[in-house]
Amino acid sequence: MKHPIHVTSEIGELQTVLLKRPGKELENLTPDYLQQLLFDDIPYLPIVQKEHDYFAQTLRNRGVEVLYLETLAAEALTDKKLREEFVNRILKEGQADANVAHQTLKEYLLSFSNEELIQKIMGGVRKNEIDTSQKTHLYELMEDHYPFYLDPMPNLYFTRDPAATIGEGVTINKMREPARRRESLFIEYIMKYHPRFANHNVPVWLNRDYKFPIEGGDELILNEETVAIGVSARTSAKAIERLAKNLFSRQNKIKKVLAIEIPKCRAFMHLDTVFTMVDYDKFTIHPAIQGPKGNMNIYILEKGLDEETLKITHRTSLMEVLKEVLGLQELVLIPCGGGDVIASAREQWNDGSNTLAIAPGVVVTYDRNYVSNALLREHGIEVIEVLSSELSRGRGGPRCMSMPIVRKDI
């Protein structure tokens, strides 16, 4: 089998993608804990699943192989000791052992089949699921109004963030927010133990044990030699610097890393919520990330004199930097919402800039962003719209919901 991971651009024909079908974790959202679990609203599960299935089928209709995170994770945990190790790490990282006797919860989880185990970990464990007669410690029996022994993981359907593919390797990411930290553990075990990946020594450019956060929504592969990474509310400049050094020393094709600073707020959570590539010479952009004259902070990172030094160049014109690294004379930045102050803010909030390119000039978008979609079509882009009334409540679009595994080179 050829190498299982190959991604050298944002727009090469998508061949294999990783998704996560929304599940029980969304039904474990309650108003009291929305902020803690990073949601603004509670999606209606039957409809959000129908919309996600429609999204997956749309990709299949264009020849894309669709893999599911929950399936790969279950298939990776075939060994009994491995299952136990995985559960121990999930409980430790979820701080579940602070709420209930570790052994009680561990035994409960290990009583399930692999598929059920993964769904239960993702969905969360409510306190009323554990039989009181099985509780052997005083603190387990004390009244506590927090409803979970193990928190649900409702953000998992945004598979873009826990990891990112660069070339034939991955970053397995330390997530900034505690509610999402366990997510990348699934990717770690899949890469190490799933037969599709385990025998290929997949390079890990940056691992989840690195102390500074980085998330896949901030990682964009512009071409074989250039990666753009957002310095954002979720991704640290220190993590970008470490990743750049690792890429330059271990991945000899990457020559430049662009660190693009964006406003650190929830509406502009990741770079891909305000900026995505849709064709060889076209990008969507939310105008609010730039200053009045189109200026913003961009830092070009290149290899220094040795493995631990970098050459860093500060620039302020995104347009000029993109033309330079892509070798283009002309380039188009298509404004989300057509640049209208109301439409752009509304459609960006509903991920109008978060397009998923499945081939050069072919993108998947949410149907609700009709102003942005019309503008993309005016620029010659084929726009494939997917249903979005419930999916969009999670504040992520088609790019957020997908992790490319294989793309054709452009």
From Swiss-Prot:
Subcellular location: Cytoplasm
InterPro entries the record matches: Arg_deiminase (IPR003876)
Pathway(s) where this gene product acts: Amino-acid degradation; L-arginine degradation via ADI pathway; carbamoyl phosphate from L-arginine: step 1/2
GO cellular component entries: cytoplasm
Nuclease as UniProt keyword: no
Location of the active site: C400 (amidino-cysteine intermediate)
Keywords: Arginine metabolism, Cytoplasm, Hydrolase
Gene Ontology biological process terms in this record: arginine catabolic process to ornithine; arginine deiminase pathway
Catalytic reactions of this protein: L-arginine + H2O = L-citrulline + NH4(+)
Pfam families to which the protein is assigned, alphabetical: ADI
Enzyme Commission designation: 3.5.3.6
Disulphide connectivity of cysteines: none
Family annotation (NCBIfam families): arcA, PRK01388.1
Name this polypeptide is given: Arginine deiminase
Natural source organism: Bacillus cytotoxicus (strain DSM 22905 / CIP 110041 / 391-98 / NVH 391-98)
